A protein has these predicted regions:
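Iron-associated oxidoreductase/ferritin-like identity signal
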Residues: 1-156
Length: 156
């Protein structure tokens, strides 16, 4: 089915962000494991895999619309030098993703592409859940202090 190029561009923009986030979260998971924070490492690895599933669905939709998925383009990967900085950088990135997805949903509405709108809404819900998790973690760091928070992250 031939899709609107504007929609394909939106999908490729979201795909670029997802591909970047896969790598960012995978590297963060490995760093967290190296630092001994196994609980956070497991969470980040799972999130990396979730982002990969989003990318897969985006690629499938682009191909369905007879577009070409751009898997060569990536944004800058943002890695923190400590856990709190990583959480903050990830929250910043997820907030940008939520805005991008909301804008994409609106574009889909304007161009009457309900199938792509549904896909972007589903990814949006996942990203909003991750925003909530990151905000909670940063709140815990603030209330407990970094040392107590990190002590809770040592074991799965």
């Amino acid at each position: 089915m031939k899709g609107d190029q504007t929609i394909i561009d939106v999908l490729n923009d979201v795909l670029t962000a997802e591909l970047t986030t896969i790598n960012q979260y995978f590297l963060a998971a490995r760093m967290l494991k190296q630092w001994g924070f196994d609980r956070l490492a497991v969470y980040y690895r799972k999130e990396s895999i979730d982002e990969m599933k989003h990318a897969e669905r985006l690629i499938d939709r682009i191909l369905f619309l007879e577009g070409l998925p751009n898997v060569q383009r990536m944004n800058k990967i943002m890695i923190g030098e400590n856990v709190e900085e990583q959480l903050k950088l990830d929250l910043d990135g997820e907030l940008v993703a939520v805005k991008r997805l909301n804008d994409g949903v609106q574009t889909c509405r304007d161009l009457r592409d309900n199938g792509t709108e549904t896909l972007l809404r589903e990814i949006l819900v996942s990203e909003e859940e991750h925003v909530d998790w990151l905000e909670t973690q940063l709140d815990l760091v603030g209330r407990l202090g970094a040392t107590a928070y990190l002590a809770e992250q040592l074991k799965e």
